[in-house]
Each structure stands twice: as structure tokens, then as C-alpha cells.
Amino acid sequence: MRITMKFTKMQAFGNDYVYIDAIHQNITNLPELARFVSDRHFAIGSDGMVLICPSDKGDFRMRMFNPDGSEGEMCGNALRSVGKYVYDHKLTDKTELVIETLGGMQHLNLTVTDGLVSNIRADIGEPRLNTKVIPVNTNLDQFVEQPVEVLVKTFHITA
């Protein structure tokens, strides 16, 4: 695949995504592009791709694609990074933003220090803990503080 585009790779709490300004660039073949840019061996490598798009409902629209090319509803870490991206790249001067996602309208409050975003607060609502709604391979209805052994260490996780 050969394309020319401008992108930014950002990381938030361990999630790294490729962010693309789809306001000023025409981006096509989104599932294929997401699979390509996410490949850690032959491309940029990431947990997925995020497009920053215009919105009729909010300040911006976030489209998030998983490494397999499927479009996801929402990711809080990606959402906060979108807030930083749009402010730091001068797409907005607002410090309170409404971002349209497949998961609904999300609200961000940005703290700016010396002209750059230094902190972001996101109100993404109550966590969804129903294992039938989120992809968790378990027979439990909720996966809360459950022991998971990784190598020789046990972690208690909530998913």
C-alpha cells in the first residue's frame, strides 16, 4: 500500500493510536488503512487508527478503527488524545469540547499551559461491565476484580 498522508502517533495510558486529520485530508479505504498502519512489523504500528472529522452534532467527530479494520464505538484514551490533538494543532481554541463518537456525544474539558494541552478531563459516563456487551471470554455476567494469572504473577482486573 502506498499513500501520502499526514498523521500523528500519540500514546495515552498505554494505548497508542495513529491520528489523522480527516478535515483537511481525504482519507479512503478506512478498514484497509487501519489494518496497514496498525501493523507493528511492516508499518507504523499501533492499537488502531483514529480519524478526526467534522461533525454536525458536536465540535468534532472521532472515528476509531481497531487493528483488524473494524470500527469501534469509543475509547476514552483515544478520546482524550483527540482533545489534545485538535487544540495543539490549532483546529480549535475552545477548552470545552463535545466530540461525536459511535458511542454517543462525549464531553472534554482541557487544561492549557503555555499554549498546549496539559490535562484533559473526559466525562464518558458510567462504565459498562456487562460481559455480553464487551468482549470478555467468561461465563460471568460481570468481570470485576477477577484474578488473572500472567506468567507467574496474578493480577486482579476489571473488564
Show which residues each predicted segment covers:
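Active-site proximal loop and beta-alpha junction motif in alpha/beta enzyme cores
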Residues: 1-74, 79-159
